[in-house]
């Protein structure tokens, strides 16, 4: 097994809150998968939820070495929690195609948040 990519991102939660205040649900619609959207709609802290998902997806795009472009979209990366609560990634569409092309066998995700920031790191492994 070899490390194929590493990405980290930090998000200022107030920045996400400001975007939501200005443009409503548009950012959430662009960033979240259908499953994440269903959670976001009823979440007790939707801004924090969105900020954490955004951080993971930015970190994943950096780990892939592409950023969000060339057919990749935020909603092709889905963040979910396993039975122990650990954050995991599920891929769709072009993100899945790219992972298969690169030979990604494992994706490791870590996520942290404090009052003002959400931070995520993603490691891609063969």
From Swiss-Prot:
SUPFAM superfamilies according to UniProt: 4'-phosphopantetheinyl transferase
Keyword Nucleotide-binding: no
Protein's name according to its UniProt entry: Holo-[acyl-carrier-protein] synthase
Transmembrane segments: none
Subunit structure and binding partners: Homodimer.
Reactions catalysed, as given in the entry: apo-[ACP] + CoA = holo-[ACP] + adenosine 3',5'-bisphosphate + H(+)
Cofactor dependence: Mg(2+)
GO cellular component, as recorded: cytoplasm
Major location category of this protein: cytoplasm
Gene: acpS
GO annotation, biological process: fatty acid biosynthetic process
UniProt keywords, alphabetically: Cytoplasm, Fatty acid biosynthesis, Fatty acid metabolism, Lipid biosynthesis, Lipid metabolism, Magnesium, Metal-binding, Transferase
Domain of life the protein comes from: Bacteria
Taxonomic lineage from the root: Bacteria, Pseudomonadati, Pseudomonadota, Gammaproteobacteria, Enterobacterales
Subcellular localization(s) per the UniProt record: Cytoplasm
């Amino acid at each position: 097994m070899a490390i194929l990519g590493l990405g980290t991102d930090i998000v200022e939660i107030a920045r996400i809150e400001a975007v939501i205040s200005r443009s409503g649900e548009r950012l959430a619609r662009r960033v979240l998968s259908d499953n994440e959207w269903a959670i976001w709609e009823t979440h007790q802290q939707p801004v924090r939820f969105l900020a954490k998902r955004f951080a993971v997806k930015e970190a994943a795009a950096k780990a892939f070495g592409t950023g969000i472009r060339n057919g990749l979209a935020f909603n092709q990366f889905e963040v979910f929690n396993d039975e122990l609560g650990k954050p995991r990634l599920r891929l769709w569409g072009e993100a899945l195609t790219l992972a298969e092309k690169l030979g990604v066998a494992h994706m490791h995700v870590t996520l942290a948040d404090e009052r003002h920031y959400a931070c995520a790191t993603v490691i891609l492994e063969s």
